[in-house]
From Swiss-Prot:
This is D-arabinitol transporter. It comes from Klebsiella pneumoniae. One of its GO terms (molecular function) is transmembrane transporter activity. Residues 29-51, 102-107, 163-172, 259-263, 317-323, 382-383 are extracellular. Residues 1-7, 73-80, 129-141, 194-237, 285-295, 345-360, 405-425 are cytoplasmic. GO terms for cellular component: plasma membrane.
Amino acid sequence: MSINNKQWLGLPLNLLWGYIAIAVFMTGDGFELAFLSHYIKALGFSPAEASFAFTLYGLAAALSAWISGVVAEIITPLKTMMIGFVLWCVFHVLFLVFGLGHANYALILLFYGIRGFAYPLFLYSFIVAIVHNVKSDNASSAIGWFWAVYSIGIGVFGSYIPSFTIPHIGEMGTLWLALAFCLTGGVIALVSLRHIQTPQHMQNLTTREKFSELGRAATLLYTNRNILLSSMVRIINTLSLFGFAVIMPMMFVDELGFSTSEWLQVWAVFFFTTIFSNVLWGILGEKLGWMKVVRWFGCIGMALSSLAFYYIPQHFGHSFAMALIPAIALGIFVAAFVPLAAVFPALEPKHKGAAISVYNLSAGMSNFLAPAIAVVLLPFFSTIGVVIAYTALYVVAFFLCAFIRVEQPGFSHKEATAREQVEFS
């Protein structure tokens, strides 16, 4: 299969409109991220109940993320994206009308959970399109751009737009506006990705062989030690991102006196920073080595900036300027894990879809575990207990990285691994 090599700073131009579709769709999906937990609490539910809704959402997202890579290879990335697009729109409407509209907690969990199954099909299937349409030694920067447009959508526009719309049309009006963005993103993807190159060998498999390949997305975790360790590091990667979106609105708004709009703007600055850091770390990963960037900048950087995100606002109180410092730091270092997306398919070059499914599963599990940790620890240790737990896990990830061996294009095996890795005893 021929690959189009035209690019701009690592951005594959043949997939440009696909990247734009991701940004627009995730803008709509991101509207709720930084205020929904607070809004559910305002409907009369406890912080733990609000966090559990996100936990269930994350569990559904993890399941969907797990199958998305293989399904995208079997039925093509575009068809998988369209399934996710339709599911998202249908269950978003049901969530708003029957869940939030009637303050019915059971229906909130049901429809929000099912909707959580939808967005990974749209989002992560595009990674399969990237992997099969760019050279492997450019994969890190191409996926860096993927996470950059993801950040533009879910974080920057997804946070800034609600900060201006909520004072005028309220939370529910803002959530209805999200539907328009997701509809637009889905249509852009449908039109622009019709002619992308996708592998054909999976589409000719028998039904039994297709299920066997789908199962490989799970079996890789115990047949390939490097995949297992990389999965654990990827799960830890975004704990603070998903966890802080749940617990920090309550700290900033209810405890420190920030308005909802101010908090949303702080959160948007975090995501705005990741636009540039995703691209930067993707490129640096190709220059310095994938695992070196992940270990020394991702793990250590996130451990320190997660602590700062709690202690600096606690020390300075209602200071918008000081709150931006840890937000920017968090945005810089969370993106240093970007090279992991290139590590997974490099570890299983003959089963890239299954490897990407494990990567996607790990991202989804992070979405699930981050609020789950908050649900367990918040009643006993308050916000600081959750922050310390996340920090400790980043330190664990630092040590796990030392055992991951991967051949990186452009690096000798010795250069890429020997100095950073230790043999299991």
